[in-house]
Design a protein with these regions (language model features):
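NAD(P)-cofactor binding segment of oxidoreductase domains
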Residues: 60, 64-109, 125-136
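Glycine-rich Rossmann NAD(P)(H)-binding loop
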Residues: 155, 182-188, 216-223, 232-235, ...
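Substrate-positioning beta->alpha
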Residues: 162-171, 182-207, 213-214
Length: 302
């Protein structure tokens, strides 16, 4: 297939770039060129900022007929409207990367039909608005969109934590016996998915014909409390973590930017009902166990 990625070298997308290249697809990546060391060897790469499309880039995009376009970097409704204008009538399928952060607090397994939306975190609110634009374009213009909702996705070169942006700083905190902040009592249930597994599911979905207009959560079926996630770090590093439990609301009041992703997302119970995607991808649950995935991330950090 002839596939266009806008993005493709981030923590969620790099695995997909490498997997699709290995399967022989004709893959083109448009990135700003900040992480070219992550590019697969044989893909076509164009260095450009897709938010500022010049005449040459516009001609290249519109003069090619793409089987699939995946934009990893849509964060608001204006970007969604731009891509609809740019690609409608020129592609077979367009994949919008949304997020499971759009769901509010739900005390049962989450499936794609649930309409309880996150109104707290601006990131999630913007993704919801973009989703609505794409869904309307599918209904009114037959725009061939497929909406994918990944959860908290990590990879070999990232360390997933409850504090956004902490990353490898967590390993330093543990090794230096510093306090490690855990929101509330650490008992909220959370789901972490390795980017290799997201890539495998995306690859399968790209090959399917009759899924335009569909929405899929792409998340692991394994879930753990934040307390248990940090216990895995303890086991892997063979080092006791000096945890400090702090109410999420207190974190937010002290630091809005730090606390917003917690009160708007990471303090929720996020357990998923994956029955929809299991019906079309039989080996969906063959995912990397969290213990094994974090072992790979820690090895990379060393």
């Amino acid at each position: 297939m002839k596939i266009l990625f806008i993005g493709g070298t981030g923590s969620i997308s790099t695995s997909s770039s490498h997997l699709l290249e290995s399967k022989g697809h004709k893959l083109t990546l448009i990135t700003r060129g900040n992480r070219t060391e992550r590019l697969p060897d044989t893909v076509k790469h164009i260095t450009a900022d897709f938010n500022y499309i010049n005449q040459d880039l516009y001609k290249y995009i519109t003069r090619n007929l793409w089987d699939c376009v995946v934009n990893w970097n849509i964060y608001n409704k204006d970007q969604a409207l731009r891509d609809i204008r740019l690609f409608n009538g020129r592609i077979k399928k367009y994949y919008f990367i949304s997020t499971t952060a759009i769901y509010g607090q739900i005390n049962r397994p989450i499936n794609e039909e649930i309409e309880i939306y996150n109104t707290i975190w601006d990131y999630a609110v913007s993704k919801i608005k973009a989703e609505n634009i794409f869904r309307e374009a599918h209904i009114k213009q037959n725009f061939p969109v497929v909406i994918l909702r990944p959860g908290h996705t990590y990879c070999d070169f990232t360390i997933p934590t409850n504090i956004q942006g902490l990353g490898y700083g967590l390993i330093e905190q543990i090794n230096e016996d510093e306090e490690v902040l855990i929101h509330n009592d650490g008992e909220s249930q959370w789901t972490l998915t390795h980017s290799d597994d997201f890539a495998k599911v995306l690859s399968s979905l790209l090959a399917l014909e009759d899924i335009n207009g569909e929405i899929f959560n792409i998340v692991s079926s394994e879930y753990k409390t934040w307390k248990n996630i940090y216990m895995i770090y303890e086991d892997q590093l063979k080092k006791k973590i000096n945890t400090c439990n702090v109410p999420a609301e207190f974190i937010y009041k002290k630091d809005n930017l730090l606390g917003l992703p917690i009160i708007g997302d990471k303090q929720k119970n996020m357990i998923f009902d994956n029955s929809k995607i299991r019906k079309i991808i039989p080996d969906f649950d063959d995912f990397i166990l969290l213990e094994d995935g974090l072992k790979r991330s820690i090895h990379w950090a060393k």
